[in-house]
Amino acid sequence: MTDKELKRSVLTVTAFASFLTPFMGSSVNLALPSIGNEFGVNAVTLNWIVSSYMLSTSVLLLPAGRVGDILGRKKIFTAGLVIFTLTMILLTFTPNIKWLIGARVIQGLGSAMLFATNLAILTSVFPPGERGRAMGINVTAVYIGLSSGPFLGGLLTRYLGWRSIFAFLVPMGIISLILIRTKMKEEWAEAKGETFDWQGAVIYGFSLAAIMFGFSKLPSAAGWAITASGLILMPLFVMREKRTKYPLFDITLISKNRVFAFSNLAALIHYAATSAIGFFLSLYLQYIKELGPRDAGFVLMCWPLTMALISPAAGKLSDRQNPGVL
C-alpha cells in the first residue's frame, strides 16, 4: 500500500467512526422524552442516560489513550468499535431503565477507546503540513453526525420508536469494522515496551468520577463532600505523574506547552457551554413547547450543521495560517 493510499484509508475509517458516536449522542438526546414516557421516569433519571455515558467516557479516555500508545492504537480503536457496536444491540432490546443505563456505561468504554485513538492515528499518518486538512475532515464527520442525529433520530423515534436509533447504528458499526479489517493495515504503538501507570489511572479515575458525580448531587451535603474528595485526589494524581517514569499523562505538557494548554482550555470552555444544550433543549422543545421529535430535531440540528459546513475550510486554512488566529 502506497503512502497516499494509506492516508486515504485511515482518513476514511476514522471519519466513518467519528460519525457514529456524535450521531448516537444527539439522537438519544432527542429520544429522551419518549424513553421517559415508556419507562415512567423523571428528568433526573433521564439525565443519567446521558451522564452515565459521559462519566464512563471521561474516566476511561486518558487510560485508553495510554494503552493505545503501548499496545497499539489500531487494536484499541478496533476493540472500542466492537464494544460500541455490541452495546447498540443491547440497547435495542433493553427491557428497563437500569439495563439501559448499565449498557450506556459499557458503551462509554467503547467510546473512550475510539476517541482516545482516533486523532492519534491521524497524527501518526499525516505530516504536520497535512494534519489541519485531515482533522478538518474528521471534525466535519463529527458535526455531520451531530447535525443529522436530531433529524434522522427524530424521524426514527416518531415512526419506528426510540429503540430504532440504536438498531440503525448497528450495521454502520459493522461496516466500520469491515473497513478497518480491509483498509487499515498498519499499527502504531509509539510507547511499545513502556509500563502502564495503574496507580495513576486509579487515582485519576476516582478523582474525575467523584467530581462529576458530586456535581450531579449539588447542592446537597453529600454532593459537596463527594466533589471535595475528588478535588483532593487531583493534586495527588499530579504528584504521582511527576514522580513516575512512564506517566499516564505528561503534566509538563500543560506547564511548558502554552499552545497545548490553551487549546485544551478553549475546548473545555466550548464543550462545557454546549454539551448540556442538547439535553435541556430537547426536553424543553418537546415537554414545554409540545413539539414532536421530528420538529424538535429540525431545531437541534441548526448549530452542528453550521459547524459541519465550516470545519473543512477551517482545517485546510489552519495548514496555511496561524491556527491561534483562527
Tell where the protein language model's regions lie, with residue ranges.
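Transmembrane-helix bundle of Major Facilitator Superfamily
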Residues: 1-182, 302, 310-326
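12-transmembrane solute porter fold
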Residues: 9-20, 28-30, 160, 222-223, ...
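Rossmann-like NAD(H)/NADP(H) cofactor-binding core
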Residues: 44, 204, 294
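Hydrophobic transmembrane-helix bundles of small-molecule transporters
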Residues: 158-265, 270
